[in-house]
A protein has these predicted regions:
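Conserved catalytic alpha/beta core of Sir2/sirtuin-type deacylases, generalized to analogous enzyme cores
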Residues: 11, 50-52, 57-63, 71-73, ...
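Short glycine-rich loop/turn motifs that provide flexible caps or phosphate-binding loops at active sites
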Residues: 5, 9, 17, 58, ...
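Short acidic/polar capping segments at secondary-structure boundaries
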Residues: 3, 18-21, 60-64, 84
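Solvent-exposed alpha-helices and their adjacent loops that cap or buttress functional pockets
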Residues: 6, 46-50, 100
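Catalytic cores of soluble, metal-dependent hydrolases
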Residues: 65-185
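Exposed alpha-helical structural elements
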Residues: 12, 35-39, 66, 95
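Active-site histidine-anchored catalytic micro-motif
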Residues: 1-36, 146-149
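Alpha-helix-centered segments that form part of catalytic cores
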Residues: 34-59
Length: 185
């Protein structure tokens, strides 16, 4: 309904929280797409997949008005890059874990788009004022020390856009440090 591209994969958070966000609709769905959307929201017979109050975004900088509406409508937590720099990885991690204290399992999805555009060349949507590699490593390593973390993924690495394999190497370094911390726990 709201993704500017019109592609169903442009609304993963909306699908996860079971939200059509029709009040911000920019597309009319044909019957086939509507059925696919409903199937996607109900995959696994779990609906919604996650509660909006259990979502935290870190270093979210560039989003469409439709996404902003969804975040504000549901009061989803957003921590800016400036907050990470001002408060440090340990304090941000502590704040997030305290906010999610009622959750039994925490899924960490690291989108390389959250890195600053000066280093995130191998992704489809690089944006300035993002996190530095070391800041991400510190944040992820702090999260990985918590036993509630049940899954960790790295998304949006696009090798066809990468320059000299830099993005892949950064993602690998972050993954390697995360795995090392998991092995120590």
């Amino acid at each position: 309904y709201t993704t500017p591209s019109g592609n169903i994969h442009g609304m993963p958070m909306a699908a996860s929280i079971g939200e059509d966000n029709k009040e911000m609709s920019v597309h009319e769905l044909d019957e086939k797409t509507f059925k696919q959307w409903e199937q996607l929201k109900n995959i696994g017979k779990i609906y919604p997949k996650v509660l909006p109050e259990d979502v935290v975004f870190i270093s979210l900088r560039d989003f469409e008005k439709e996404e902003k509406h969804l975040i504000e409508k549901h009061g989803m937590k957003v921590i800016t890059t400036a907050e990470v720099r001002r408060n440090g990885a340990e304090n941000v991690c502590r704040k997030v874990l305290r906010y999610l204290s009622d959750c039994t399992d925490i899924y960490v999805s690291f989108d390389v788009d959250s890195l600053d555009s000066s280093i995130s060349k191998g992704t489809g949507t690089p944006v300035s004022n993002g996190l530095r590699e070391r800041e991400v490593e510190d944040l992820i390593s702090k999260f990985m020390q918590n036993r509630k973390i049940c899954c960790f993924e790295i998304t949006e690495v696009n090798p066809t856009l990468d320059k000299e394999n830099l993005m892949a190497e950064i993602a690998f370094n972050i993954l390697q440090r995360s795995v090392n911390i998991l092995m120590m726990n």
